């Protein structure tokens, strides 16, 4: 899975291609 998104609860999921602010970069 790639990309990213944030739920209204404040949790975020990050794909390998995600560069969204607030997401941890691994």
Curated annotation (Swiss-Prot):
Superkingdom, taxonomy of origin: Eukaryota
Any one GO molecular function term: metal ion binding
Binding locations of Cu(+) 2: 6, 23
* TM region positions: none
The positions annotated for binding Cu(+) 6 are 14, 18
**Residues that bind Cu(+) 5, according to the entry?**
12, 18
Disulfide topology: none
Keyword entries, A-Z: Copper, Metal-binding, Metal-thiolate cluster
- Which residues participate in Cu(+) 1 binding? 4, 23
User: Could you say which residues bind Cu(+) 4 here?
Assistant: 12, 20
Q: Which amino acids does the record list as binding Cu(+) 3?
A: 6, 20
Other comments on record:
The seven cysteines bind six copper (cuprous) ions.
Q: Give the family from UniProt.
A: Belongs to the metallothionein superfamily. Type 8 family.
Q: What is this protein called?
A: Metallothionein-like protein CAP3
Could you tell me which species this protein originates from?
Answer: Colletotrichum gloeosporioides
Lineage, top ranks: Eukaryota, Fungi, Dikarya, Ascomycota, Pezizomycotina
């Amino acid at each position: 899975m790639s990309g990213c998104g944030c739920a209204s609860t404040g949790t975020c999921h990050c794909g390998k291609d995600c560069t969204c602010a607030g997401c941890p970069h691994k």
